[in-house]
Regions:
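Ordered alpha/beta subdomains of enzyme catalytic regions
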Residues: 1-119
């Protein structure tokens, strides 16, 4: 059993981000960009670890601490967390209920091959 909840893997305020998006949005693209090197004359990074992250957190942790638990239990825990963090009128719990009902994360990930050198 992991000592972390999938529900706590994102900043709390991100639960309100969908309210800022236009109605009818069907696609959203995000990027992860490496920060500037802290070492002189070192301008490249190796891209690695995404496959392990997806497996451990986006599949196993999501299943163990969210999708495989009873819906009522998950929603009650999530509401308690969000109510304490951002207030009960600041979010739509229906989004979380729909995600639980879907039983998987509806994301498409496109990435460089593991081990790619990026500059």
């Amino acid at each position: 059993m992991r000592n972390i909840s999938f529900m706590l893997m994102a900043d709390t305020y991100k639960n309100t981000n969908p309210d800022a998006l236009p109605d009818g949005l069907t696609k959203l693209t995000s990027y992860i960009t490496p920060r500037k090197s802290m070492f002189k004359n070192l301008n490249e990074v190796v891209f690695f670890g995404l496959q392990a992250f997806i497996k451990e957190y986006m599949i196993e942790l999501a299943n163990d601490t969210f999708f495989k638990r009873p819906k009522e239990e998950v929603i009650a825990e999530y509401k308690k967390y969000l109510d304490n963090q951002i207030g009960s009128q600041s979010y739509d719990i229906g989004r979380i209920e729909k995600l639980w009902e879907l039983q998987y994360l509806p994301v498409e990930i496109k990435a460089l091959p593991e081990g790619s050198v990026v500059n």
